[in-house]
């Protein structure tokens, strides 16, 4: 949206494909996992699916579960059409020798993994390719896992070695014709180099190109909820003319940054992956002077749960753009300590601009991941501020569902989804100030009434659990989520935590003469079931007794929306026109009205997944307004009070879900 400080406001929707240059590298790729101890993050050249199910442990890669579709993709190297051949090999073995008798599955390679958007990130998360490896039956295979090899394979010998020292799997291209190419898979004794068996087949040339991955793929839930390690891998090597190197695709150890600049203070949050305990826990921030000299301006400890380092620097004496870099010295696998830099630019406050451009986002699902159309087109507009109004992640994001407990696994599960957000928007975030605020799905809720931070009483029925009000997840986990998304915002107006010690972040920020109030319209909101009659049969915030109730029956004088603390903040904010403020804008998760419509026969939103998607310009027949109390049209009394305060500042409202 474009915000003109002269007169009116023009709202435009900015939805944003990018290609990266490659280096045709003749050197072989060789994995290096010889780190001391354990580390969840595999390294800057890899993406693991999912993050919490893999680790480096004493010099090798391990899959920590016996479950379906676990993989580690190489993101800096690809197989491409321009070459003619490649070879690839890895050592592989069973972590648990009893796996052969208990599980059906396989381990090995994925060749030519591709998604639907022709992007290496999409390939790494959703790509499908040619499987090639060894099954728990002892058969080698390429492509069709259900077919048994006809070659004379000594299956017992293969499985015995897999259970002991492991074997070396080697795949290479063979003969080729115009349309097809031969793939040959061989198994070797890892110690002696003796060839144990081989299997070959012909594959369409076009499907060999794409990402390369290691994979452990077993029947789901063999061990129920028990996490049982399955396979280890080591010495992954690839070479050949089809192999191309993209060094700029490295992801980490600084994954991405977010920053704000307001009233002479800049705050920058750097996001890190789950590094091992033996890695350094401090990062520093440097600014570049006019003489291109870098000066250290802050050093911070990486928070052990959110894996963030947040820097705060007074920049009131630096009115222009400020080149910055986050500096981290660490120990990559197989190397001495190295120093990595992640650079960006803190933009000058655009107070001299007549028009301020704001790109606003909400509901960042992964249907179009990595959203290259969105990011490229947004950058064409060169916005002055990015605003993410909630649901930066959804529970199913990236596949594999979501983890509610234990807290350590739930944390890594969330971080993987959050890293995907940074993978999408990182190039914008490093150079453009941004606001992010958390909504329900960010904290693993379908709907949320924060009720001042109370603990929601657990219930097997998710709707009942949410209707109780408060947070389902532990407070330390909620605080972790908020640190990842909001710690770069200006300091909160009143930092006192709410119930359970859950932190707050509501604040104000000045950009280009516009004062933005950033509020939390979910954290204090009362759950309707706590204050409304049982006769309304409230389920997940919907009165299911009737399609439409008298609005007066649904209102409650007791129910809160923003709470006393945020109302006091807004009363202060609307009266404060300091710091060259000439316009005001409010940022919230949800609009202060109930505008959703549903068919007149529906009593809740459970029908939504079954509704027909209308064409542009077409409106559904028989739709009428809803009484969804997850929206901020409810509670009406508290909503009206909030609007009365906000209108005193003539504030333009930027909000997310309807809800």
Question: What name fits each language-model region?
Answer:
Residues 194-231:
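Flexible glycan-contacting loops in extracellular carbohydrate-active proteins
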Residues 103, 107, 174-179, 186-188, ...:
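Metal-dependent phosphoester/phosphodiester hydrolase catalytic core
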Residues 52-70:
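Short carbohydrate-recognition loop motifs
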Residues 3, 15-28:
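Bacterial Sec-dependent signal peptides at the C-terminal "C-region" and cleavage site
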Residues 88-90, 160-201:
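Carbohydrate-binding surfaces in secreted/extracellular proteins
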Residues 143-170:
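Short, aromatic/His-centered strand-loop micro-motif at the edge of beta-sheets
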């Amino acid at each position: 949206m474009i915000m003109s400080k002269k007169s009116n406001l023009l709202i435009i929707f900015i939805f944003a494909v990018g290609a990266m240059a490659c280096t045709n590298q003749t050197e072989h790729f060789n994995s290096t996992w010889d780190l001391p101890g354990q580390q969840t993050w595999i390294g800057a050249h890899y993406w693991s699916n999912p993050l919490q199910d893999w680790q480096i442990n004493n010099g090798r890669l391990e899959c920590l579960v016996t479950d379906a579709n676990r993989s580690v993709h190489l993101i800096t190297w690809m197989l491409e059409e321009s070459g003619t051949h490649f070879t690839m090999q890895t050592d592989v073995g069973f972590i648990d020798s009893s796996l052969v008798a208990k599980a059906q599955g396989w381990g090995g390679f994925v060749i030519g993994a591709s998604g639907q958007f022709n992007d290496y990130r999409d390939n790494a998360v959703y790509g499908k390719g040619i499987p090639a490896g060894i099954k728990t039956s002892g058969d080698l295979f390429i492509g069709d896992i259900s077919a048994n090899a006809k070659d004379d394979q000594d299956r017992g010998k293969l499985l015995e070695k897999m259970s002991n020292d492991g074997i070396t799997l080697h795949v290479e291209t063979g003969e080729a014709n115009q349309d097809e190419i031969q793939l040959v898979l061989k198994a070797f004794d890892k110690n002696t180099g003796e060839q144990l068996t081989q299997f070959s087949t012909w594959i369409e040339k076009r499907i060999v190109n794409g990402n390369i991955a290691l994979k452990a793929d077993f029947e789901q839930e063999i061990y129920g909820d028990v996490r049982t390690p399955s396979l280890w891998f080591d010495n992954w090597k690839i070479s050949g003319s089809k192999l191309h190197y993209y060094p700029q695709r490295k992801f980490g150890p600084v994954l991405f940054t977010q920053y704000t600049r307001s009233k002479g203070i800049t705050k920058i949050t750097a996001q890190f992956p789950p590094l091992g305990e033996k890695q350094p826990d401090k990062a520093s921030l440097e600014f570049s002077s006019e003489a291109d000299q870098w000066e250290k301006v802050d050093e911070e400890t990486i928070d052990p749960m959110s894996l963030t380092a947040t820097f705060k620097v007074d920049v009131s004496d630096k009115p222009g753009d400020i080149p910055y870099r986050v500096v981290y010295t660490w120990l990559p696998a197989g190397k001495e300590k190295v120093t990595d830099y992640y650079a960006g630019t803190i933009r000058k406050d655009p107070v001299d601009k007549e028009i301020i451009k704001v790109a606003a986002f909400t509901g960042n699902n992964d249907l179009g991941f990595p959203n290259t159309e969105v990011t490229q087109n947004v950058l064409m507009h060169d916005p002055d501020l990015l605003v993410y109004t909630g649901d930066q992640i959804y529970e199913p994001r990236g596949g594999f569902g979501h983890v509610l407990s234990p807290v350590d696994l739930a944390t890594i599960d969330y971080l993987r989804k959050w890293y995907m957000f940074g993978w999408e928007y990182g190039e914008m975030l490093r150079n453009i100030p941004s606001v992010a605020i958390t909504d329900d799905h960010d904290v693993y809720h379908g709907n949320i009434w924060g009720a001042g931070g109370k603990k929601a009483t657990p219930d097997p029925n998710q709707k009942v659990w949410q209707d109780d009000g408060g947070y389902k997840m532990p407070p330390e986990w909620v605080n972790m989520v908020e640190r990842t998304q909001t710690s770069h915002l200006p300091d909160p107006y009143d930092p006192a935590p709410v119930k359970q010690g859950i932190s707050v972040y509501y604040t104000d920020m000045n950009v280009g003469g516009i004062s933005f109030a950033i509020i939390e319209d979910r954290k204090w909101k009362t759950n309707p079931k706590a204050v409304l009659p049982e006769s309304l049969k409230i389920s997940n915030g919907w009165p299911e007794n009737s399609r439409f109730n008298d609005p007066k029956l649904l209102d409650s004088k007791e129910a809160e929306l923003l709470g006393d603390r945020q109302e006091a903040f807004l009363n202060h904010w609307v009266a404060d026109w300091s710091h060259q403020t000439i316009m005001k804008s409010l940022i919230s998760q949800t609009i202060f009205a109930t505008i959703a419509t549903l068919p007149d026969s529906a009593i809740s939103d459970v029908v939504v997944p079954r509704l027909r998607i209308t064409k542009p310009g077409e409106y559904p027949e028989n739709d009428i307004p809803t009484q969804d109390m997850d929206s901020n049209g409810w509670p009406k009394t508290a909503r009206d009070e909030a609007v009365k305060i906000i209108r005193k500042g003539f504030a333009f409202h930027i909000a997310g879900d309807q809800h």
